[in-house]
């Protein structure tokens, strides 16, 4: 039988020590457990992550309300349903919530159930999770993704003065996933040596996602450090750079400009730290000419559509422009961005939209117009490796899930190694074949 026998949620802690939701679902096949991630820099259009707001517990970040919503509202409705009806179950949960942004039940409550349903259905069908997701999404070619490793952390993810949030290494010259992982790990260790030599041992402390957080202020310094590490590791021309600028986090609405010094003390700020959208475009053009950058995520504020469209028109044939805060994995925002030609790739985050079915639909909409799709973790992660199976099953060809450091990040990379091993001669590695460049 593929019917749900029980559903139970609990409050656990994520990799930042903040509470999150974990859901256990049982069928005759056994117990299926899923844990929900959480972001630090979040887009204003994301689905609602329900927090308790009780300052006496976890500084207001508790999730007992979301847990209660699973145990008292969703569980009674889900028991007895067929786990192989993913779309119907997800739609039912959205119906019960009844809000545009999942503010009633919380996306963290709905997603935990949705992921566990997916796992249970895969077990019922006797399929690995990635195979079942491929079937669910209509994808006939599971594919190992190009991994993008966040090796220097700034922005909301680190206590340094870097405005831009992530500087990533992307092994575009690898021929397999295991080779890509080795290349990245070797470059990561070389980067540690470069940073240690230049800034001292304490500069090699790591941020939320396992990347280094040296106390540098100029964003181009981060790029130069990575270029040096790639060279030292012997991978010049085989590893390129990706960036997550997370520009919404330093958009100054009052000045209608971008504040590159938003983490710098007021008395140390200089006028040139405030730049216009046009100024940022010039900066990115300069960097993409000078450094081996192939992907830039969230280069502008989530509502700065005009600048996105202008930038994409200028540079889409050279690099991938990824929408994260711009799109929030939301089909409506994706359609709007498609119409405005505002970017050429989607960052797909399960908890931004809040259910497996909606994430599958978001991927479909992006691939329909040949956009790249990069599946992503969040800065607050758990040992749950669902997204590793998701990216292979969807066959979208790109993943970012932190540095090759910290167990909650390696849980995903190691699962991808296992999947590659299981596929054997049928394992296909995406490299850059599914990027949004040129679209």
Swiss-Prot record:
Superkingdom of the source species: Eukaryota
GO biological process: glycolytic process
Active site: 209 (proton donor), 349 (proton acceptor)
Principal location: cytoplasm
EC main group: lyase
Cofactor: Mg(2+)
GO cellular component, one term: phosphopyruvate hydratase complex
One Pfam family from the record: Enolase_C
One example GO MF annotation: magnesium ion binding
Reactions it catalyzes: (2R)-2-phosphoglycerate = phosphoenolpyruvate + H2O
Pathway note: Carbohydrate degradation; glycolysis; pyruvate from D-glyceraldehyde 3-phosphate: step 4/5
Residues noted as binding substrate in the record, renumbered to the chain: 157, 166, 297, 324, 376-379, 400
EC number(s) on file: 4.2.1.11
Residues given in the record as Mg(2+) binding sites: 244, 297, 324
Co-factor remark: Mg(2+) is required for catalysis and for stabilizing the dimer.
Compartments, record wording: Cytoplasm
Keyword tags: Cytoplasm, Glycolysis, Lyase, Magnesium, Metal-binding
Subunit structure of this chain's protein: Homodimer.
Protein family: Belongs to the enolase family.
Official protein name in the record: Enolase
Protein's organism: Mastigamoeba balamuthi (Phreatamoeba balamuthi)
Higher taxonomy: Eukaryota, Amoebozoa, Evosea, Archamoebae, Mastigamoebida
Gene name of the encoded protein: ENOL
């Amino acid at each position: 039988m593929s019917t749900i026998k029980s559903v139970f949620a609990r409050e656990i802690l994520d990799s930042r020590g903040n509470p999150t939701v974990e859901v256990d679902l049982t069928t005759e096949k056994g117990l299926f457990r899923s844990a929900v991630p959480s972001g630090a820099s979040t887009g204003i259009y994301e689905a609602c992550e329900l927090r308790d707001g009780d300052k006496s517990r976890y500084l207001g970040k508790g999730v007992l309300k979301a847990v209660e919503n699973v145990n008292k509202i969703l569980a009674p409705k889900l028991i007895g349903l067929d786990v192989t009806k993913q779309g119907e179950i997800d739609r039912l949960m959205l119906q019960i919530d009844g809000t545009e942004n999942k503010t009633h039940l919380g996306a963290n409550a709905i997603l935990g159930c949705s992921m566990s349903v997916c796992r249970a259905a895969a077990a019922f069908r006797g399929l690995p999770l990635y195979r079942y997701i491929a079937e669910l999404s209509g994808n006939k070619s599971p594919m190992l993704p190009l991994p993008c490793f966040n090796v220097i952390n700034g922005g909301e993810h680190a206590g340094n003065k870097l405005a831009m949030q992530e500087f990533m290494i992307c092994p575009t010259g690898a021929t397999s996933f295991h080779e890509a992982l080795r290349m990245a790990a070797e470059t990561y260790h070389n980067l540690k040596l470069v940073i240690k030599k230049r800034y001292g041992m304490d500069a090699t402390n790591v941020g939320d996602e396992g990347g280094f957080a040296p106390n540098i202020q100029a964003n181009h310094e981060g790029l130069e450090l990575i270029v040096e590490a790639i060279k030292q590791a012997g991978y010049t021309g085989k590893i390129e750079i990706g960036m997550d600028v997370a520009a919404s986090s330093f958009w100054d609405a009052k000045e209608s400009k971008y504040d590159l010094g938003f983490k710098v003390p007021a008395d140390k700020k200089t006028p040139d730290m405030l730049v216009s959208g046009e100024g940022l475009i010039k900066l990115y053009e300069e960097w993409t000419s000078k450094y081996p950058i192939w992907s830039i995520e969230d280069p502008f504020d989530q509502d700065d559509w005009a600048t996105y469209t202008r930038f994409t028109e200028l540079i889409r044939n050279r690099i991938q422009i990824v929408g994260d805060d711009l799109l929030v994995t939301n089909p409506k925002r994706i359609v709007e961005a498609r119409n405005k030609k505002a970017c050429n790739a989607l960052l797909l985050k399960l908890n931004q939209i809040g259910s497996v079915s909606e994430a599958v639909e978001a991927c479909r909409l992006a691939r329909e117009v040949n956009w790249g799709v990069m599946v992503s973790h969040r800065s607050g992660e758990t040992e749950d490796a669902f997204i590793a199976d998701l990216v292979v099953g969807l066959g979208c060809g790109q993943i970012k899930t932190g540095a090759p450091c910290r167990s909650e990040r390696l849980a995903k990379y190691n699962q991808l190694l296992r999947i590659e091993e299981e596929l054997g001669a049928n394992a296909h590695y995406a490299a850059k074949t599914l990027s949004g460049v040129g679209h």
